[in-house]
């Protein structure tokens, strides 16, 4: 079972505190696996591998966080998800990231956007021959006591100019895009949210030893 908490625009520090609360409850088995879905006011956050040259050059504040990955931006028009999920042993961090990617690739497909994984790069991408790869969703996670924190940010209709002040995710040869840019119309967070709920419910939770083994028909996704 995957539960959801739906919020509007929440300051980053407030959402981070809520993540920690839910994480402690999930570790103690007091709640089911739970995903926060929300937006943030404009903010830069830097993962543990962020280099100085990747930070904004104009002195814009950056919040250091305990997730993997590098620097990114969050803000209105971007649907942010924080899945708090207890993983089975042995812990498969890469598998967790891949399941998030698969869910978001499916969301993009639901809207008519062909998105893919790019080898060696986390997140969800749009690729075109002869053009730079364009990131449409960023992913950065942390696992503590077998339970995940942080998650993903899917660009619906944000102001992409914020990304020009940084080296997003430490990738100077890549660009950032959104569902609205790719489709040529305004794609809102409200439109995308139910699709994300459906696809996370379908893909996110890992198989556990007690789960029913699916038939070949139900496993063909």
Swiss-Prot record:
GO terms for biological process: protein modification process. Residues 29-208 form the BPL/LPL catalytic domain. Pathway: Protein modification; protein lipoylation via endogenous pathway; protein N(6)-(lipoyl)lysine from octanoyl-[acyl-carrier-protein]: step 1/2. Keywords: Acyltransferase, Cytoplasm, Transferase. One of its GO terms (molecular function) is lipoyl(octanoyl) transferase activity. Signal peptide: none annotated. One of its GO terms (cellular component) is cytoplasm. Gene3D superfamilies: Bira Bifunctional Protein, Domain 2. The record marks 135 as: Lowers pKa of active site Cys. The keyword Transferase applies. Its EC number is 2.3.1.181. It is an enzyme of class 2 (transferase). Substrate binds at residues 67-74, 138-140, 151-153. Pfam families: LplA-B_cat. The active site is at 169 (acyl-thioester intermediate). PROSITE patterns: BPL_LPL_CATALYTIC (PS51733), LIPB (PS01313). In the reaction, the free carboxyl group of octanoic acid is attached via an amide linkage to the epsilon-amino group of a specific lysine residue of lipoyl domains of lipoate-dependent enzymes. Catalyzes the transfer of endogenously produced octanoic acid from octanoyl-acyl-carrier-protein onto the lipoyl domains of lipoate-dependent enzymes. Lipoyl-ACP can also act as a substrate although octanoyl-ACP is likely to be the physiological substrate. Belongs to the LipB family. HAMAP family: LipB (MF_00013). This is Octanoyltransferase. It comes from Acidothermus cellulolyticus (strain ATCC 43068 / DSM 8971 / 11B).
């Amino acid at each position: 079972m995957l539960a959801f908490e739906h919020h509007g625009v929440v300051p980053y520090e407030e959402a981070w505190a809520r993540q920690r609360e839910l994480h402690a409850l999930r570790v103690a088995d007091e709640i089911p696996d739970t995903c926060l879905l929300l937006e943030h006011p404009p903010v830069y956050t830097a993962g543990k591998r962020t280099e100085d040259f990747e930070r904004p050059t104009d002195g814009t504040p950056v919040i250091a966080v305990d997730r993997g990955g590098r620097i990114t931006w969050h803000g209105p028009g971007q649907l942010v998800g924080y899945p708090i999920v207890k993983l089975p042993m042995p812990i498969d961090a890469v598998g967790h990231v891949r399941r998030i990617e698969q869910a978001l690739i499916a969301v993009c497909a639901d809207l008519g956007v062909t998105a893919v994984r790019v080898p060696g790069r986390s997140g969800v991408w749009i690729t075109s021959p002869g053009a730079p790869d364009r990131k449409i969703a960023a992913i950065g996670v942390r696992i503590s006591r077998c339970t995940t924190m942080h998650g993903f940010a899917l660009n619906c209709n944000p102001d992409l100019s914020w990304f020009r002040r940084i080296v997003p995710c430490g990738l100077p040869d890549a660009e950032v895009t959104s569902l609205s840019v790719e489709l040529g119309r305004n794609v809102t967070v409200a439109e995308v949210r139910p699709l994300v709920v459906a696809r996370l419910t379908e893909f996110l939770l890992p198989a556990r030893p007690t789960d029913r083994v699916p038939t070949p028909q139900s496993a063909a996704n």
